[in-house]
Amino acid sequence: KDVTALHGAEINEAVSRVVNNGWYLQGAENEKFEKDYSEFVGTKHTIGCANGLDALIWIFRAYVELGVMKPGDEVIVPANTYIATILAITENGLVPVLCEPKPNTLEIDDDRIEGLVTSKTKAIAIVHLYGRIAYTDKIGDICKKYNLKLIEDCAQSHGCRHTDGRVTGSIGDAAGHSFYPG
């Protein structure tokens, strides 16, 4: 089956535009995508980068550079995640604290998170999996109670809507997306 039949011509035209104008990085096409994606997600800014790992590394790096987090601080993260989520944390000298998933959704178990919070905890990284939103109001309440940053890994959940209408990538303090097809 021709999987490109529906959008093949449009994709070829877009690729041709990028290749023929010589701007493979940054440039007008990238700026337009960042603007359009920000509108789609409902955020002020989008920054294009190479991949989801880089996006997450840059988020944690920014918080370290700004002094919001420092090496040795902890980030609660679901045990059921792709390794990039963990690598982004450790790359910045932060310590991942694994939280077991809910057995019925395989997403971070919001009933276990608060028991993992310590004086060194600075953030919760949620991973929206299988097109489902991992965020719950309980997670938001925990972040508020302990003044924690909420980081979203949205590699598997572009455009999912929370019951309050917010879209994945606009729920937390920062979010990383990936367009890798695997």
Where do the protein language model's features map onto the residues?
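N-terminal "arm"/small-domain region of PLP-dependent enzymes with the aminotransferase-like
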Residues: 1-23, 28
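Solvent-exposed, non-membrane alpha-helical residues enriched in polar/charged side chains
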Residues: 16, 20, 34-38, 60-61, ...
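Phosphate-binding glycine-rich loop
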Residues: 23, 28-74, 88-92, 98-99
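Structural detector of well-ordered beta-strand residues that form the stable sheet scaffold
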Residues: 47, 76, 97, 150-151, ...
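Short beta->alpha connector loops at strand-helix junctions that form conserved
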Residues: 79, 98-102
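Conserved coil-to-alpha-helix start sites within the AMP-binding
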Residues: 80-86
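Active-site phosphate-binding strand-loop segment of PLP-dependent enzymes
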Residues: 104-182
